[in-house]
Regions:
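Extended, charge-rich, solvent-exposed interface segments
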Residues: 2-58
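Active-site flanking loop/helix segments enriched in acidic
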Residues: 55-76, 120-124
């Protein structure tokens, strides 16, 4: 028996974590690479070129308890939804596939700020006060504003919504 050096601790030794994260991320990248719209490509690249974001995205949980409630759960959930969007979009010729696939990627990214997953999963203060939809919208708007020339209507089309939000 000895002392455990918490600086060398790997949380995956103590809490449930996605085991094949690199493989799941590769699946996600392959599908997103099929997005042809230049503005959407720039937006997607802005996320994947951002190492601090990627580190947090790879580790984030998608929920506190109901689904994908483990480290890496947000990556897994996002990949599954992007796969579904890419598969279903061609069934609806009037739908812009690139927009649907990109929106599927964006839809829960606010959970990076909404949830924290240490030894236990819980909501952050921002998560309790405003939630992942508002946080995700702000994240997306900040990124699109940083890309010169992104059409404003495209920003509006990408605003994530949630079935729990009531219409006015």
């Amino acid at each position: 028996i000895g002392f455990y050096d918490k600086k060398q601790a790997d949380l995956s030794d103590f809490i449930e974590s996605l085991e094949n994260g690199a493989e799941v991320e590769q699946q996600l990248r392959q599908i997103l690479a099929t997005v042809a719209d230049p503005w959407l490509r720039k937006l997607l690249n802005s996320y994947f070129d951002d190492e601090p974001f990627l580190g947090r995205f790879r580790a984030a949980t998608a929920a506190k308890a109901w689904h994908h409630a483990f480290r890496g759960g947000l990556l897994k959930h996002t990949t599954e939804l992007v796969e579904l969007a890419a598969a279903v979009a061609p069934l609806f010729p009037e739908v812009n596939r690139d927009l649907v696939v990109t929106a599927a990627f964006l839809h829960d990214l606010g959970k990076i700020e909404e949830m924290e997953a240490g030894l236990a999963i819980d909501y952050t203060t921002a998560g309790r006060l405003v939630g992942h939809i508002v946080i995700g919208n702000q994240m997306m708007l900040d990124r699109t504003r940083a890309i010169t020339g992104v059409p404003a209507p495209l920003q509006l089309q990408l605003l994530p919504t949630d079935k729990r939000l009531k219409e006015a």
